[in-house]
């Protein structure tokens, strides 16, 4: 086990408890069905984020643009969906930290950056990741679904040889997200 895995092993029991008590399952996103996955993601995103400071619902154009931009770097195991009876109730969006691909690219050459990024992604040598978004439907908050998603992300990131994660984009005034991250 890596240090990453050992530090957070307590989340296993929480995830198991949430699954057995509530019948919630977590699955990977499906890159081959990207359009439908984005639709499912947006249903939860708009409801989960509507009360966050500064939230503005994304337009269809923005969603399409983001999906096209993220598709080359998305690792399906790091974009989990939590489901209850086949309905999405929560999601996570974790992306590789591409800053490591920028290191050594002082020339600023786009082709070199893209080649290095592609190589790092294919050889699983990106050791860092960033939690970009986490969204849970309001009626499922406080029931451990966040712990279940964090557990999934931690486990799958470890399988990708990731040893470090960052949630620096988390809104400072989101006590639920802060508490979940601090418990990890």
Where would I find each of the regions flagged by the language model?
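Residues at or immediately flanking beta-strands
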Residues: 25, 54, 164-166
């Amino acid at each position: 086990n890596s240090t990453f895995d050992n530090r957070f092993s307590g989340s296993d029991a929480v995830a198991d408890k949430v699954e057995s008590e509530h019948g919630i399952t977590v699955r990977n996103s499906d890159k081959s069905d990207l359009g439908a996955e984005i639709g499912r993601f947006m249903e939860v995103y708009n409801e989960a984020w509507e009360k966050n400071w500064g939230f503005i619902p994304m337009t269809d154009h923005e969603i399409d643009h983001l999906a096209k931009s993220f598709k080359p770097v998305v690792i399906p195991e790091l974009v989990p969906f939590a489901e209850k009876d086949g309905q999405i109730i929560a999601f996570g969006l974790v992306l590789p930290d591409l800053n490591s691909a920028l290191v050594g690219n002082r020339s600023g050459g786009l082709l070199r950056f893209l080649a290095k990024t592609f190589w790092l992604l294919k050889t699983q040598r990106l050791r860092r990741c960033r939690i970009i978004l986490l969204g849970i439907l309001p009626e499922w908050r406080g029931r451990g679904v966040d712990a279940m998603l964090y557990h999934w992300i931690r486990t799958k990131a470890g399988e990708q040889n990731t040893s470090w994660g960052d949630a620096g984009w988390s809104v400072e005034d989101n006590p639920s997200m802060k508490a979940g991250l601090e418990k990890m």
